A protein has these predicted regions:
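Hydrophobic h-region of N-terminal signal peptides that target proteins for export
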Residues: 9-18
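Acidic/His/Gly-enriched intrinsically disordered linker/tail segments
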Residues: 97-121, 128, 147-281
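Juxtacatalytic substrate-recognition/specificity segment
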Residues: 21-152, 204, 238-241
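Histidine-centered active-site/metal-ligand motif
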Residues: 15, 135, 139, 157
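Sec-dependent signal peptide recognition
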Residues: 2-10
C-alpha cells in the first residue's frame, strides 16, 4: 500500500484532521513524550506509547545518520505528533477517505520558512506492527533540510521508499521496468518537476522511477550528497546542482545515464538499493 503525505504552506488544518487539543477526546488515549515526539495510542486496544516512542527515536536517529542530518537534529518545536489508530474507521476519520489504500499519512505544515506542525497518523497492522512508520517518518525528518520549502516529490518519495520492506521495493522496481518496457516511463524532465498526478496511470511509473533514480544517485556519490544535491536543485535549479554534485551537464544527460542504469539493473536482476536495513521489518 502507498503512503500519503501532505505539505501545507499555511497554518490552516485540512478538514477532518485532529488538533492536538482533540486527541485527548473520546476514545481515551495514552501518551508518551520526548524531545522530538508526542505519541498517542488508544488506552484499551493500542500499543504501549512508550514502546512506540522508543521505536520512533531509534528510527529518527538512524535516518539522520544515513542521510547526513545528525548534526542538524535539534529538538523539534513543535513536537511530531504520532497518532496510532487501531481501526480503519478511526484512521480514515483523521486523514480522509482518499487515504483508504494507505497505512500511514504524514502531515507537515510550513509557515514563514519553518515547520509549524509535524504529524503522522498510522493504522496499526493486524499483527500489531506499524509497517508505515519508517516511510512516513522519513518525510518528517527530511522536511527540516529544505529551508522551509517542500522537497521535490520524486526525492521525498524515493528516499521514503528506501525505508520500506524489500518486498515493497521489489514491486516498485517491477513497475519501473514495466514502464520502461512499455514506453510509458516518464521523461526525467517531467519526473523531476512533477508535484501532482494528472492521471492515476502515472503513479506506478512515478514511484518506481523515483526509487530507481534515488538509488542510482545515492550510490554514485553518497546518500548525504544526494540530499545536498536536492537542496541545491530546489534553490538554484537542476542544471546547476547536477553539474556541481555529479558533473552531469543537463537533465537530458541524466535521463540517458539513468535509462542505461535501469536497463543494466534489469539484466542483473533485483539488487538492494541504498541500505537502511535496520528500518526494515
Amino acid at each position: 500500500m502507498k503512503s500519503a503525505i501532505r505539505f501545507v504552506l499555511t497554518l490552516l488544518l485540512l478538514h477532518g484532521s485532529i488538533d492536538a487539543d482533540d486527541v485527548s477526546a473520546s476514545p481515551p488515549l495514552k501518551e508518551a513524550r520526548s524531545d522530538y515526539f508526542v505519541i498517542y495510542t488508544t488506552a484499551h486496544a493500542g500499543p504501549s506509547p512508550s514502546k512506540v516512542l522508543t521505536l520512533c527515536e531509534e528510527l529518527r536517529s538512524e535516518l539522520c545518520r544515513v542521510w547526513g542530518l545528525a548534526h542538524r537534529a535539534k529538538k523539534w518545536d513543535p513536537l511530531c505528533e504520532i497518532v496510532v489508530h487501531t481501526s480503519a474507521a478511526s484512521y480514515l476519520a483523521s486523514v480522509g477517505p482518499e487515504a483508504a489504500q494507505t497505512r500511514g499519512c504524514s502531515r507537515i505544515e510550513l509557515h514563514n520558512g519553518k515547520v509549524s506542525r509535524r504529524r503522522i497518523d498510522l493504522q496499526m497492522d493486524v499483527d500489531g506492527s506499524l509497517s508505515a512508520l519508517a516511510h512516513e517518518l522519513t518525510h518528517v525528518v527530511l522536511a527540516d533540510r529544505f529551508h522551509g520549502k517542500p522537497p521535490a516529490h520524486w526525492l521525498d518519495e524515493g528516499i521514503a521508499t528506501l525505508a520500506d520492506s524489500r518486498a515493497k521495493q521489489l514491486l516498485h522496481e517491477r513497475d519501473c521496468q514495466d514502464a520502461l518496457s512499455s514506453g510509458h516511463a516518464l521523461p526525467l524532465q517531467q519526473l523531476l518537476n512533477l508535484e501532482g498526478f494528472t492521471s492515476p496511470a502515472q503513479m506506478p511509473a512515478f514511484y518506481g522511477q523515483s526509487l530507481s533514480l534515488v538509488s542510482m544517485l545515492a550510490r554514485q556519490r553518497t546518500p548525504q550528497q544526494l540530499i545536498d544535491f536536492a537542496v541545491d536543485a530546489r534553490d538554484s535549479g537542476y542544471p546547476f546542482a547536477l553539474k556541481k554534485h555529479y558533473n552531469i551537464n543537463s537533465v537530458a544527460e541524466l535521463d540517458v545515464k539513468w535509462r542505461a542504469h535501469a536497463k543494466a539493473s534489469r539484466h542483473v536482476g533485483p539488487s538492494s538499493p541504498v541500505l537502511i536495513a535496520s528500518l526494515r521489518p
